[in-house]
């Protein structure tokens, strides 16, 4: 379970970085050269999703919970936005959903 969760967090970081770098280029006038590491990051994201042993739909559903929590951590750490109690609650609910789905992988 820990390996799966850590893999999901790495996957989420790859996706967020792959989307954040073009955002910097489009909205913050950063260099277009950021598109190269963005593309590499998104390729890494896709590859990481293939490393899970479950059916792709289950992987995507469970990954969504970790993505929510990771995106909120990114919001706090990178963007400097203070998270509300409801943000934390939502992340907890999303992670609980991920744990429920991943627990069912063995039964399916």
From Swiss-Prot:
Pfam families: UPF0060. It is a multi-pass membrane protein. InterPro entries: UPF0060. Its main location: membrane. GO terms for cellular component: plasma membrane. The keyword Cell membrane applies. The keyword Cell inner membrane applies. It is found in: Cell inner membrane. Belongs to the UPF0060 family. This is UPF0060 membrane protein Spro_2289. It comes from Serratia proteamaculans (strain 568).
């Amino acid at each position: 379970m820990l390996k799966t969760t850590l893999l999901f967090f790495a996957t989420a970081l790859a996706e967020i970085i792959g989307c954040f770098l073009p955002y910097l280029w489009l909205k913050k006038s950063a260099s277009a050269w950021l598109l190269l590491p963005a593309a590499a990051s998104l390729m890494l994201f896709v590859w990481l999703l293939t490393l899970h042993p479950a059916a792709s739909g289950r992987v995507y559903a469970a990954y969504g919970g970790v993505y929510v929590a990771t995106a909120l951590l990114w919001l706090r750490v990178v963007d400097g936005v203070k998270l509300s109690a409801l943000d934390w609650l939502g992340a907890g609910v999303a992670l609980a959903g991920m744990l429920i789905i991943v627990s069912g992988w063995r039964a399916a």
